[in-house]
Amino acid sequence: MDPTLISLGALALAGAAATVSGCAEDLESDVGSQSNPNSQVQLGPQMGNIHRYFNKAISGEPVSYGLYVAVAGTIAWALINAGLNAVLAIIVGSGVAAVVHGAYSVSAFLGRTVGQSKKFGQPVYMDVLTSHIGPIVGHGFIAVFTMTLAAYLATTALGNPFPLPLVALIFGITVGAIGSSTGDVHYGAEREYQKYPFGGGIPVANQGDIDIYAEYGVRNGLDSSYFCSRFGGPLTGLCFGLIIFLDGWRSILGNIIGGDLVTKTSIALLVGLLVVAVAAGINRKLEVYARNKYGPYRN
């Protein structure tokens, strides 16, 4: 079979895996309330808002997912070199990373909540721990497995010269950064502050004054994940999937058109710059259109 067709198929599969991983990563952070929005959850009891959110800001998402995917990639790489099937090796590595993820989540939830119990009266809800840890580990496993699979495809079928553990680390940091900057806005700026008028941002005076009641009953992290699965999660997946797909596409295009290595590299760089320029132009057009259409925010 034509090597170009194999590369295109591997790129399509890697892009699809990256899309799933981005969505799962964002929804996992919504269930556990990690990254930027967690500062508001942490401030809640200090503002008198006793809540039932799962409070587990282990670290920023880029650092934590860099760790999880690097663990999975390293174990998978070792098992593949030992002769195990690649898919099984990735599953085993992702399973170990899920255990690490769960251990950090439990310790972070208990530690951060107990630290606020005596002074601010925030209880440690054990049912919140037991009901949330499953979705956290489950979403995390899906995210880590698909990211490790995309990294494996990059190192085998797409010609990435770096070893699997290093590519997995880079992919983990990347998806964590995208989830923190893209999907978490839907959770932190909207879901946590639905009692305030939409579009007003989060003034300093409102920080920590989060919603503690849901449409029915008391709100928790599972409610946040359900809400964000309709926009924030898919948007994060689309963003990460496009990054992986377009980055691989420019390299394949350079290999098809170019002759020597310098020409291939130059074409790939030019296509990459063109993609960035087009994306920036579309973003600018959308922002200007939205501002002209809806005008400035008014309370």
From Swiss-Prot:
Pathway, per record: One-carbon metabolism; methanogenesis from CO(2); methyl-coenzyme M from 5,10-methylene-5,6,7,8-tetrahydromethanopterin: step 2/2
Organism domain of life: Archaea
Keywords in alphabetical order: Cell membrane, Membrane, Methanogenesis, Methyltransferase, One-carbon metabolism, Transferase, Translocase, Transmembrane, Transmembrane helix
Subcellular location(s) per record: Cell membrane
Its EC number(s): 7.2.1.4
Predominant subcellular localization, coarse grouping: membrane
A cellular component annotation (GO) from this entry: cytoplasm
Species in which this protein is naturally found: Methanococcus maripaludis (strain C5 / ATCC BAA-1333)
Family annotation (InterPro entries): MeTrfase_E (IPR005780)
Organism phylogeny: Archaea, Methanobacteriati, Methanobacteriota, Methanomada group, Methanococci
Pfam families: MtrE (PF04206)
Catalytic activity: 5-methyl-5,6,7,8-tetrahydromethanopterin + coenzyme M + 2 Na(+)(in) = 5,6,7,8-tetrahydromethanopterin + methyl-coenzyme M + 2 Na(+)(out)
Spans traversing the lipid bilayer: 57-79, 95-115, 133-153, 158-178, 237-257, 262-282
Family listed: Belongs to the MtrE family.
Annotated membrane topology: Multi-pass membrane protein
Job description of the protein: Part of a complex that catalyzes the formation of methyl-coenzyme M and tetrahydromethanopterin from coenzyme M and methyl-tetrahydromethanopterin. This is an energy-conserving, sodium-ion translocating step.
Subunit and partners: The complex is composed of 8 subunits; MtrA, MtrB, MtrC, MtrD, MtrE, MtrF, MtrG and MtrH.
The protein's name: Tetrahydromethanopterin S-methyltransferase subunit E
